[in-house]
Amino acid sequence: MVGKSVVTLDGLSTNQILDLLHKAEYIDSHRKEIAHTCDGRVLATLFYEPSTRTRLSFETAMLRLGGKVIGFAGAQLASVTKGESIADTLKTVSNYVDVVAIRHPKEGAALVASRAASVPVINAGDGGHMHPTQTLADLATLQSRFGRITDLTVGLCGDLTFGRTVHSLIETLCRFGNVRFVLISPDELKTPQYVIDRINATDSCSYVEVRDLASVIGDLDVLYMTRVQKERFFNEDDYLRLRDTYILDEEKLQLAKPSMAVLHPLPRVNEIAVDVDDDPRAAYFEQVKNGMLVRMALESTVVGDELPGYEPLNPKEVQA
C-alpha cells in the first residue's frame, strides 16, 4: 500500500482492509508510542466542498502522528475560482506534501486527482459516489461492537440515493459476505441499481427494500441512519417533503434488540432524536473517534511510515 492512492476500497484487498482496522485498534492503545511516526510529513487537505468532521479528522490524524497539515476548506478559497483544473492543482500541491486528502462535489474528482498527483491521494468523499475512509470508520465500529463485520443484519435508513457513505458501506460489506441488508427509504430515495446489482452478485448477501422502519427494526443488528441531504436537491419542496420521513427516537428503539448498534455518518439534522444519544446502542460518536483512528492508520501506511511495535496481521498480503 505504500505510495498508493485510495480512491475506493476496491483497490485494497480484504486482508489490507482488516489490517487497517487492526492497526487502528493498535493506535488507540499506543497513542504515546506512535506520536512521532510521521515526523516531517505534510498532509494537504483539499476540500472543495464544506466539511467539518472529515476535514478535522484527517488533519488531527496527521497531527497526532507527528506530521503537519496545509490546505483549504471551500472552493472559493482555491485557485479553481481562477479557472485552475483539479489536475493542475494536484500537480502543484504534490511538490509540497507527502499525501493529499481531497473532497469534491463531483463524482470521479478523486480519481482525476489521483492520476495527476505524484503522491498518494485519499478520497475524502466525491459527490454521491464513494467515501472510503467513512466506510473504514463504519467497519471499525462494527468490529468494536460485535467483534466481526460479517453475519449481521444491517438496516440502512433514509437517503439511500445520494448517500455516498451508504453505497461505500454496502459494496465493502459485500466483499466480506454473509450480510443481510434491509434498505429502508421512501421511493424517491431508493438505493441505486448499481448498488443493488452488487448485492445480487454476492451469493452470501441478500436484501429487502421497505418503507417502514418500525416494522423491521426488531430484526436488525445494525441501524445505519442517514440525513436527507438538502445540498443534493434542486427542488426545495422535494427536500422539505422528504426531510422528516424517518426519525429515530426512544419509542422506536424500544422495538429494537438490546444489542443493536445505531450508526450515523453525521452531521445529523433531526433524523435521530437527542434522547437517543444516551442509549447504549448509540454508536455514532464512537464512529467519530474510529474515523480519526483509521485515518491515522491509512495516512501512516500510504506514506510508508511504520508504527513502532506494530505487527501486521498478514505481512506478505498487507504489503502488496
Swiss-Prot record:
Reaction(s) this enzyme catalyzes, per UniProt: carbamoyl phosphate + L-aspartate = N-carbamoyl-L-aspartate + phosphate + H(+)
Binding locations of carbamoyl phosphate: R53, T54, R103, H131, Q134, L266, P267
GO MF entries: amino acid binding; aspartate carbamoyltransferase activity
Family: Belongs to the aspartate/ornithine carbamoyltransferase superfamily. ATCase family.
Binding partners and assembly: Heterododecamer (2C3:3R2) of six catalytic PyrB chains organized as two trimers (C3), and six regulatory PyrI chains organized as three dimers (R2).
EC number: 2.1.3.2
Name of the protein in question: Aspartate carbamoyltransferase catalytic subunit
GO biological process, one term: 'de novo' pyrimidine nucleobase biosynthetic process
Role according to the record: Catalyzes the condensation of carbamoyl phosphate and aspartate to form carbamoyl aspartate and inorganic phosphate, the committed step in the de novo pyrimidine nucleotide biosynthesis pathway.
Encoding gene per record: pyrB
Keywords: Pyrimidine biosynthesis, Transferase
Pathway: Pyrimidine metabolism; UMP biosynthesis via de novo pathway; (S)-dihydroorotate from bicarbonate: step 2/3
PANTHER family cross-referenced by the UniProt entry: ASPARTATE CARBAMOYLTRANSFERASE, ORNITHINE CARBAMOYLTRANSFERASE, MITOCHONDRIAL
Residue numbers binding L-aspartate: K82, R164, R227
Pfam families tied to this protein: OTCace, OTCace_N
